[in-house]
């Protein structure tokens, strides 16, 4: 299967389940022109199959540059690992103007939204069932699974973490994107300074 690049056929569990008592925020990027880093961040959870068992992966991405700012693995679907990823991204890269999620209970929970509200970040949420509203990170998941997860069938959590970490580093640092003139996500997020001549 690995050599033939065959994708296993199975029904992935849903990673987004709405909580009936949690507040749902409107989708803010609908008519927004995104022109700079830290204007909009997004996050999502995906299912990571292993040879025996599975894990859940959450990532925080800068929408403009496509750079993965942080990520976490967990064997449960609680909000804790999502909050850890959010706090890490904010500690390393500051705060976005808008933070977009789906309507999953992890992201609508009071603990998660409190982190954003305390930082005065505007909260945005996809329309129900509208994966296209968070298409940037959905494309990331597709590439990660096709190029890393399905080709390796990791045995353990540590192997999975190492493999995903290597892939994300390569994605951030080496993969060019046509939308940014073939710059990598890291280059688009942190444009190189123009060399200026210093007057004598």
Language-model segments: which ranges?
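Charged DNA-binding/catalytic regions of mobile-element recombinases
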Residues: 1-200
């Amino acid at each position: 299967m690995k050599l033939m690049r065959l994708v296993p056929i199975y029904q992935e569990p849903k990673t987004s389940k709405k909580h009936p008592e949690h507040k749902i925020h409107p989708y803010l990027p609908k008519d927004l022109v995104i022109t700079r880093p830290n204007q909009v961040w997004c996050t999502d959870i995906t299912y990571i199959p292993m040879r025996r068992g599975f894990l859940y992966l959450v990532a925080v991405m800068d929408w403009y540059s496509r750079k993965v700012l942080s990520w976490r693995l967990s064997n449960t679907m609680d909000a804790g690992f999502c909050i850890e990823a959010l706090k890490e991204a904010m500690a390393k890269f500051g705060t976005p103007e808008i933070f977009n999620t789906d309507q999953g209970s992890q992201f609508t929970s009071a603990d998660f939204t409190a982190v954003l509200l305390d930082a005065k970040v505007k909260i945005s949420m996809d329309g129900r069932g509208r994966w296209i509203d968070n298409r940037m990170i959905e494309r990331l998941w597709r590439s990660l699974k096709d190029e890393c997860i399905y080709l390796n069938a990791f045995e353990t959590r540590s192997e999975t973490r190492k493999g995903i970490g290597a892939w994300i580093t390569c994605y951030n640092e080496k993969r060019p994107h046509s939308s940014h003139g073939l710059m990598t996500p890291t280059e688009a997020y942190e444009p190189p300074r123009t060399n200026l001549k210093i007057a004598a």
